[in-house]
Amino acid sequence: MIPPFEEIDIKSLLPQQPPFVMVDALLDYSEEKTVTALKVQEENIFCNNSTLSASGMMENIAQTCAARLGYINKYILKNNRILVGYIGAINNLTILREPRVGEIIVTTVQVLEQIMGMTLIQGTIKAGDEVLAEGTMKIAIAE
């Protein structure tokens, strides 16, 4: 049986481990869409001048993809494999604003296409209703 999202330890879905974890919670999963949350903390390795850097925002999107894959493997395929993914390309990334320490960001990854171990996604980061960043990313999965 699949537990409710709030009972899932997101670190159990990721290959990354602290201090490199850039997602706090899995909020939603479907075949096409995954949603995570992160509270921006001052001690985050990607924080500079009390904001999460663009690099941290890109890693947050990539780790939302990793959480999606971990969820599929653990709860749907039930094989408990944690696969490593690599950012193959980032396109049309627009950073409108870097999130500030204390803000909770919600990241949505929409799967656009999957083929031969590559996944093309559209990622969007919001703080409340405000879009902070959006763009597409290709993720390659190492087998």
Language model segments and positions:
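Short aromatic-glycine motifs in intrinsically disordered, low-complexity regions
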Residues: E7-Q17, K78-I82
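Active-site helix/loop of acyl-thioester processing domains in fatty-acid/polyketide metabolism
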Residues: S53-K78
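Conserved positions in beta-strands of structured domains
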Residues: D24-L27, N91, L96, Q110-L112, ...
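HotDog/MaoC-like acyl-thioester-processing domains
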Residues: V35, A67, R100-E103, Q110-E143
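Hydrophobic residues on conserved beta-strands that form the core of alpha/beta folds
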Residues: V23-D24, I90, L120, E134
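Catalytic strand-loop segment that frames the active site of acyl-thioester-processing enzymes
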Residues: P18-S53
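Short coil-to-beta-strand transition motifs
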Residues: Q16-M22, V101-V106
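Hydrophobic beta-strand-centered segment that forms part of the acyl-chain substrate-binding groove
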Residues: I2-P4, L69-V106
